[in-house]
């Protein structure tokens, strides 16, 4: 029989042990909402998408409360998170719902289980990888590990949801570390093959590569990033998305046009939030960065007067908006 004092000591020891087992993703603060900037939306904004590498390990006090506030500032319809622990995403989603009234469905694409990163129990560590939050329901979830992840397991996930009121395939990926170019090239090949199957797709993620990196050629051949100044042939100033002043994060659009976009640095990650408002693809609009569209009233064509240095060449659109011959 255990005395009252002994029972209390035993109970305290159990609590301490459980707290240690739960690991770094255990609750780290009360559910106190952080105030949002003036003008922040009160409801989910239709057709707004976001990608964010939330940084792990970045487990200071109040991280998930702060992450939720960053997302709520823009209230996107679809959010792709990388370096995401399942437990952290659950808390972020709870904060979004109960503190800001933003309700999201969630799907996961965990590529490994890691107690050191994501807590849990030694025999059941937390999942780590990608996650997608969507205001609309999601179906047909796929989670794929790349054959070669590089120095750490990497992969992509995909879901079908609604954007602009129509089904769209949303991908979320995190490619190999920055000094593993050959590995990333193979990973892009795997991802691009699947993206090419869908006329309407949005690819979110941390590609760990700058826009003119050779390994991204496969993506530029299929889609365009939401930043018109970022691309293999763009000549403008490409806005960076990391604390080390590089562009690693992308929202690739296929079958959509970018309406506007923004980059928001964050205290809660070494990556910035990249968000964009998108709309259906308009016939005749040239989408490749680094090109201009010239309207010629004397001819029945539209063409790029400065063809981008792009694997599939410059595009010519006839007056009826249908693609013409490639030059």
Residue positions per predicted region:
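Secretory targeting and sorting signals
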Residues: 1-31
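Active-site-proximal beta-strand/loop segments in catalytic clefts of secreted hydrolases
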Residues: 51-57, 81-84, 107-113, 133-137, ...
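N-terminal carbohydrate-binding accessory modules
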Residues: 32-48
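Active-site beta-strand/loop signature of hydrolases that rely on acidic residues for catalysis
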Residues: 47-54, 67-93, 133, 159, ...
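Metal-dependent phosphoester-hydrolase catalytic domains
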Residues: 23, 34-38, 195-201, 209-321, ...
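Active-site surface patch of divalent metal-dependent phosphodiester/phosphate bond hydrolases
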Residues: 58-144, 220-226
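Acidic/histidine-rich helix-loop elements
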Residues: 46, 50-65, 115-118, 122, ...
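A well-ordered secondary-structure block
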Residues: 120-168, 172, 257-260
């Amino acid at each position: 029989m255990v005395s009252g004092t002994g029972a209390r000591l035993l109970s305290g020891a159990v609590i301490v042990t459980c707290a240690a087992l739960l690991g770094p993703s255990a609750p780290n603060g009360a559910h106190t909402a952080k105030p949002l900037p003036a003008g922040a939306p009160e409801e989910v904004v239709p057709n707004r998408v976001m990608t964010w590498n939330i940084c792990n390990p970045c487990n200071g006090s109040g991280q998930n409360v702060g992450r939720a506030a960053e997302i709520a500032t823009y209230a996107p319809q679809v959010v792709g998170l990388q370096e995401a622990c399942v437990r952290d995403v659950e808390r972020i989603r709870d904060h979004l719902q109960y503190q800001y009234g933003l309700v999201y469905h969630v799907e996961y694409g965990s590529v490994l289980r890691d107690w050191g990163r994501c807590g849990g129990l030694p025999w059941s560590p937390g999942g780590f990888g990608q996650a997608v939050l969507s205001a609309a329901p999601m179906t047909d979830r796929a989670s794929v590990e790349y054959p070669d992840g590089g120095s750490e397991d990497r992969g992509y996930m995909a879901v079908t949801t609604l954007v602009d009121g129509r089904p769209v395939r949303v991908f979320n990926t995190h490619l190999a570390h920055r000094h593993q170019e050959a590995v990333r090239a193979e990973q892009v090949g795997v991802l691009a093959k699947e993206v090419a199957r869908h006329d309407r797709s949005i690819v979110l993620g941390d590609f760990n590569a700058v826009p003119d990196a050779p390994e991204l050629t496969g993506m530029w051949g299929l889609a365009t990033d939401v930043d018109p100044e970022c691309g293999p042939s763009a000549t403008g100033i490409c806005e960076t998305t990391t604390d080390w002043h590089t562009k690693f994060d992308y929202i690739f659009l296929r079958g959509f046009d970018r309406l506007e976009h923004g980059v928001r640095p964050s205290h809660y990650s070494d990556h910035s939030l990249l968000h964009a408002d998108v709309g259906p693809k308009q016939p005749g609009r040239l989408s490749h960065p680094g090109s201009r569209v010239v309207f010629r009233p004397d001819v029945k064509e539209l063409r790029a007067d400065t063809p981008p240095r792009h694997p599939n060449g410059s595009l010519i659109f006839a007056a009826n908006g249908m693609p013409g011959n490639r030059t």
